[in-house]
Regions:
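Histidine-rich, glycine-flanked metal-binding segment
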Residues: 1-26
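Short, ordered loop/turn segments at secondary-structure junctions
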Residues: 6, 60-62, 149, 179-181
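A general structural motif
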Residues: 12-13, 97, 170-172
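Short Asp/Glu-rich motifs
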Residues: 13, 35, 66-67, 155-156, ...
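Divalent-metal coordination cores built from histidine and acidic residues
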Residues: 21, 28, 32, 38-143
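Histidine-centered catalytic micro-motifs
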Residues: 26-37, 175-181
């Protein structure tokens, strides 16, 4: 799409009369879970054929950063990257069709440092998580995301989330959240979020 003008105001090789139509250069999948699918088939035909041109990854969990344990997949094949940036570059290297962007997942940071234990992060773990969040921002993350309705993300305290959000805020990063509750604790979840 080069220009949007009233009919007959522009001479061009191709002119499309979009009167009474919605015009978009492409749709954005803001909650994309296609990372693994893109590793298998980068063409992303299902979304591309629906007009999706940008896949936003990383809701809660992300391609990185990964520690040695996290890199070993269930199929025993090691993931060939460590950082979020390397994971995104891996997808680009496969020649994926859509544009991709990613949040760094707060769950990924927590598992990297705390594992799956239901306990508060120590001060040292929080500082390392903040450093990993900053590194992900420097590698191109658009912000940090949480999925607080799922374990082990729900083990994180509000203070932990605030500390991580402050780290990405240093880079003008965004914060998005799948809140802790969508039911009986909805108001409390909204209070925590806002």
């Amino acid at each position: 799409i080069s220009y949007l003008v009233p009919p007959a105001e522009l001479n061009a090789r191709t002119v499309i009369d979009a009167t009474s139509k919605a015009v978009s250069p492409g749709f954005i999948n803001m909650l994309s879970w296609t990372a693994n699918a893109l590793r298998r088939d980068g063409k992303s035909q299902s979304d591309i054929r629906q007009g999706v041109t940008l896949e936003v990854l990383g809701e809660g969990s992300s391609l990185g950063p990964l520690n040695a344990t996290m890199r070993r997949r269930k199929d025993e094949a090691d993931v060939p990257w460590i950082t979020l940036g390397q994971g995104l570059e891996h997808l680009v290297g496969l020649g994926v069709s859509p544009n991709i962007a990613s949040f760094v997942g707060a769950t990924t940071l927590r598992v990297h440092e705390v594992g799956y234990e239901n306990r508060p992060a120590t001060e040292a773990e929080l500082e390392r998580m903040q450093a990993l969040a900053r590194a992900a921002m420097e590698e191109g993350a658009v912000g940090i995301s949480t999925a607080l309705i799922y374990a082990p993300a729900d083990y994180a305290s509000t203070e932990e989330l605030v500390r991580l959000a402050k780290a990405v805020a240093e880079y003008d990063g965004l914060y998005i959240s799948h809140m802790r509750s969508e039911g009986s604790q909805l108001l409390e979840a909204l209070d925590e979020l806002f």
